Swiss-Prot record:
Species this protein is from: Glarea lozoyensis (strain ATCC 20868 / MF5171)
Binding residues for pyridoxal 5'-phosphate: 91, 231
Name of the protein this chain belongs to: Branched-chain amino acid aminotransferase gloG
Protein EC: 2.6.1.42
Keyword Amino-acid biosynthesis attributed: yes
Amino acid sequence: MTENFPLPPLLGVDWDHLGFEPLEVNGHVECTFSTTTSCWTEPVFVTNPYLPVHGLAPGLNYGQQIFEGMKAFRNPSGDVQLFRPDQNALRFARSALRVAIPPVPTDLFLRAVNTAVGMNTDFVPPHGTGASLYIRPMAFASSPTVGLFLASQFKFCVYVLPVSPLHGKATQEGASVLVIEDFDRAAPLGTGNVKVGGNYGPVLGLIDEAKKQGFNLTLHLDSLSHSLIDEFSTSGFIGVLNDGEVPTIVVSDSQQVVSSITVDSICELARAFDWHVQKRPISFLEVARFSEVYAAGTAAVLVPVESILRRSTGEHVVYSVEYSSPTSCFSRLSTALRDIQQGLVPDDRSWIKLVTKP
């Protein structure tokens, strides 16, 4: 910590019961791209959370929009740190190229994120609460047009809000999962592997209906054969095989899923434990072989799965493992990941970036 930076957490906020609803913060960051200049402007901090956008902007009409998800944590010393932000910058650029948005250079992306977080450090929850500051970079085509033409103006913004873990009790007790069978999330050679809103809007109703039926998560199979596991609606899929001398972490190599930074981090930690890691097609028939299953993502971090139901076949797999046991693979992996994110152990992999005063 330096003098007056970062600011301590605000008083009067119930940091232990934040939920995931927006809370008014100090402001956000904006940058603009114009084909006239062919470059992004420098980050500007804006206090008004609302954006003046033309109703005919392609970002509103044609889905020419991308986003990211990141988190900032307060470490034991009171400093604020980001987890692998360079990887978010690279994924943001890949998403931009898919929908004809000028990629935001990595250095500009990181400066914009640093400014957005640095101007809101009083909203970073206290260390040890389990809460964090969620960071939402997003970009969209903003110039008005009704034709399918390349846009001439674009907006890049970074919003932040303090949050609790996404799935609440399921994070500790285990999530119940429903396989979605009447909707394909993504097609081969489509947009499933980038973070565009069009991948998420169509599943909102499915997620809501599943929750009404008592399910915490929804799982998608591949659209070609409906026999392979792709990912959960909002997070990556991780399975654990315990039929050898050491555990084997199994993740999908599908080209229809988002390249998950959390999944990649879990795989790296597993290798550090001298466990095996397999990245390959995952048959749905394998869910009964797994000793443990997790949903992994920025918002959820790592959520243990208690059961998976596929109604069309009557398959209902229940995992009897005690996830809270310190000997479970879940406990070892989730503890190792959280300890790094929250600054409890040395950063041997250079995954952590401290937020500096803007």
